[in-house]
Amino acid sequence: MYRTFLLFVVAVAPALAQPFGFGLKAGIPLNDALAVGPGGAISYVQSTHRYVVGPFVEFRLPARFSVEIDALYRSYSYRQSLPAAQSVSTGAWEFPVLAKKGLFGGPIQPYIEGGVALSHLSVNDVLELNHRNNYGIVLGAGVTVHLGLFRISPEIRYNGWAFRGFESPVGMLESNRNQATVLVGISF
């Protein structure tokens, strides 16, 4: 038992000495979160607020590698006009876990990233709710600019989700499984 604990401490100690960062990310989607089909017996109108925001932490590792964990909030909103008027507003919490690789050293560092994400829609049961929980892949690229104690990181990110969160029975409304987002992170 003592040897196992000692081995654990020796193995974990270098990881604890690595730089740690935290901050806030905000951005806008490049494509619509919901796709609305042509009007039929049931008509939908998308009215989603176009923003993504949330905190993140980054564990900086040797050789310009890092691991980033985000908690991003994205809003969804739509109206159903027939047969009875109904508005649905909800939010999705997305939790990407990303491996990042800095491509060059210096004060301006381009990077690539990839990983997985979990998502949870916080909505009451509605007819169009297909999957409250989702998972998918995340790919991205960006640039980190060092400004004193701050790091500013604009990036473009792609999310490929496994399921559609919303999908109407008649196919007039469905959430987009492929989402692209421009984000800017400010960290310490």
Q: Where are the language model's segments positioned?
A:
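Sec-dependent signal peptide recognition
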Residues: 1-8
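Sec/Tat signal peptide C-region and signal peptidase I cleavage site
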Residues: 13-17
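Surface-exposed strand-loop-strand hairpins of Gram-negative outer-membrane beta-barrel proteins
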Residues: 30-52, 132
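Predominantly the C-terminal beta-signal and adjacent terminal strand-loop region
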Residues: 64, 68-70, 75, 139, ...
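Residues that define the transmembrane beta-barrel architecture of outer-membrane proteins
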Residues: 18, 47-51, 89-95, 131-137, ...
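Gram-negative (and chloroplast) outer-membrane scaffold detector with strong preference
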Residues: 20, 28-30, 34, 53-124, ...
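Extracellular loop and loop/strand-boundary signature of outer-membrane beta-barrel proteins
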Residues: 39-44, 81-87, 123-129, 167-172
